[in-house]
């Protein structure tokens, strides 16, 4: 199936079949999707929590209490639930970790090439954390790049998913001690197979016309 067909067929799943689980191979593949998403300057300012056990999913679903109970069953019934987290600070230690990993992976022919790459990344990091002081927004944008990549990727695998912002981030952050680890939760994405009760599965997709959202020059 080509990528456009995948985009046309995927949708936000409203109900999951709790009896249908991802295979071990599928579970490994979704982790690979998370790992290899693009990000600005390859900064990768993220962390993921993947819940597949009943206990793990219940911990994530605590964040759906109160005003967000309508999302609780999605988190409990899906085979896997992914919590997308962003770093709360783009620190020098992280930048060093990224460039050292790139070096270990063989991306630099010379030490000078490594230094130039590191300098370029730090230019943009400093632009956001020092000049613009919007590094939190910048890092969140990278996480959302990952979410979009992930949604299309799991759809290409024949899996169903839904991006959820309707949850209590403070509850979720506290449950997993994210603040202490330098992260905050942004999006929760349950993944699995839709239920026969999923009303959204049979509805036509709706998007604004290109004449409204696209300009060609």
Curated annotation (Swiss-Prot):
Subunit structure: Homodimer.
Binding site for NAD(+): 14, 41, 71, 74, 107
Enzyme kind, highest EC tier: oxidoreductase
Entry's EC annotation: 1.-.-.-
Gene3D superfamilies, per database record: NADH Oxidase
The entry's keywords: Flavoprotein, FMN, NAD, NADP, Oxidoreductase
Residues that hold FMN according to the record: 10-14, 71, 165-166, 205-207
InterPro entries linked to this entry: NfsB-like (IPR033878), Nitroreductase (IPR029479), Nitroreductase-like (IPR000415), Nitroreductase/BluB (IPR050627)
Cellular-component GO terms for this entry: cytosol
GO molecular function: oxidoreductase activity
Names of the cofactor(s): FMN
Described purpose of this protein according to its UniProt entry: Reduction of a variety of nitroaromatic compounds using NADH (and to lesser extent NADPH) as source of reducing equivalents; two electrons are transferred. Capable of reducing nitrofurazone.
Domain of life: Bacteria
PANTHER family reported in the protein's UniProt record: NADPH NITROREDUCTASE (PTHR23026), OXYGEN-INSENSITIVE NAD(P)H NITROREDUCTASE (PTHR23026:SF125)
Database matches in Pfam families: Nitroreductase
Name of the molecule in the record: Oxygen-insensitive NAD(P)H nitroreductase
Record-level GO BP terms: 2,4,6-trinitrotoluene catabolic process
């Amino acid at each position: 199936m080509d990528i456009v067909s995948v985009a046309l067929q995927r949708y936000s799943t409203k109900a999951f079949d709790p009896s249908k689980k991802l295979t071990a191979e599928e579970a490994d593949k979704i982790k690979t999707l998370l790992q290899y998403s693009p990000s600005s300057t390859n900064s990768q300012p993220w962390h993921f929590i993947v819940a597949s056990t009943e206990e793990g999913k219940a911990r994530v679903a605590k964040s759906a209490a109160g005003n967000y109970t309508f999302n609780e069953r999605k988190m409990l019934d899906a085979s896997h639930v992914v919590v997308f987290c962003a770093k709360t600070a783009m620190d020098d230690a992280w930048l060093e970790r990224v460039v050292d990993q790139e070096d270990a992976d063989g991306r630099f022919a010379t030490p000078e090439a490594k230094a130039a790459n590191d300098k370029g990344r730090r230019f943009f990091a400093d632009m956001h954390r020092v000049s613009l002081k919007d590094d939190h927004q910048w890092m969140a944008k990278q996480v959302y790049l990952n979410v979009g990549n992930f949604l299309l990727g799991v759809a290409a695998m024949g899996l169903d998913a839904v991006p959820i912002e309707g949850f209590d981030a403070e509850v979720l952050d506290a449950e997993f001690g994210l603040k202490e680890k330098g992260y905050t939760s942004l999006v929760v994405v349950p993944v699995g197979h839709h239920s026969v009760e999923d009303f959204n599965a049979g509805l036509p997709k709706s998007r604004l016309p290109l004449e409204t959202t696209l300009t060609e020059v």
